[in-house]
Design a protein with these regions (language model features):
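Sec-dependent bacterial lipoprotein signal peptides
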Residues: 1-25
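Conserved functional micro-motifs across diverse proteins
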Residues: 2-3, 23, 27-184
Length: 184
C-alpha cells in the first residue's frame, strides 16, 4: 500500500465513528418524551386529550410569606414539603376528565402520593371534567395568575429521599401513564 493510503485510514475510521451515532438518531433513535423517557419540566405532554405541563417543583416553607398561601402546616422533623405546580388543558373538541392519580418515585422505587389539601386552598389541583380549551388552573384564577402559574400537588418527602434523584412524577389516567422528571 502506498504511504499516503496509510495516513487516510485513521481519518476515514474517525469519520465513520463520528457519523455512526448520527445515523442511529436519524433511524428512529428518538424517544417519546413523557412515555419512553421522562419529560422535562416546562414541556406540555398530551394524554387522553389533555395537555399536562409541570411548571416548577419547589420546597415549601410556610414560615415565609410567599409560601403561606400554598400550605399552612410545617413539615414534621426529618421531612420536607414540596409543591409541584402544573397545568392541565383540554386540547380536544370534547369534554375530558383530568387525571386523578399522581405518584412521585425516587431512584430507589420509593413511592409518594400527594398530601390532601383543604378544599378552600386556591392553589390545590382538583381533578375535574374540562370543556374544550378549558384548563386547570382556571384562566384568571389566583393560581393561574400567581408566580407559579399552576395548580399545586403537595408532597411530603423524608429528607434523605430528596437525594435519591431523579425524582419523577407519574400521572396516570385510564390506563395511560406520563412521566416528568422533577427539577429539585
Amino acid at each position: 500500500m502506498p504511504r499516503s493510503m496509510f495516513r487516510r485510514v485513521p481519518i476515514v475510521a474517525c469519520a465513520l465513528a463520528l457519523a455512526a451515532p448520527l445515523g442511529l438518531v436519524a433511524c428512529g433513535g428518538e424517544k417519546d418524551q413523557g412515555v419512553d423517557v421522562p419529560a422535562r419540566e416546562g414541556l406540555a405532554i398530551e394524554m387522553g386529550g389533555i395537555d399536562y405541563t409541570v411548571f416548577i417543583t419547589r420546597e415549601l416553607n410556610p414560615r415565609i410569606t410567599p409560601d403561606k398561601a400554598y400550605v399552612k402546616v410545617e413539615a414534621p422533623p426529618g421531612q420536607s414539603l414540596y409543591g409541584i405546580f402544573l397545568k392541565a388543558c383540554n386540547i380536544s373538541t370534547d369534554k375530558r376528565s383530568t387525571a386523578s392519580e399522581f405518584v412521585v418515585k425516587d431512584n430507589q422505587d420509593n413511592r409518594f402520593e400527594p398530601e390532601p389539601l383543604p378544599a378552600d386552598n386556591a392553589f390545590a389541583y382538583t381533578p375535574r371534567t374540562l370543556d374544550p380549551e378549558e384548563c386547570i388552573p382556571e384562566a384568571g384564577s389566583v393560581a393561574q395568575l400567581g408566580p407559579t402559574a399552576g395548580s399545586m400537588l403537595l408532597f411530603k418527602f423524608p429528607l434523605e429521599n430528596t437525594e435519591n434523584r431523579p425524582l419523577e412524577l407519574e400521572i396516570e389516567q385510564n390506563g395511560e401513564k406520563r412521566t416528568f422528571e422533577l427539577d429539585i
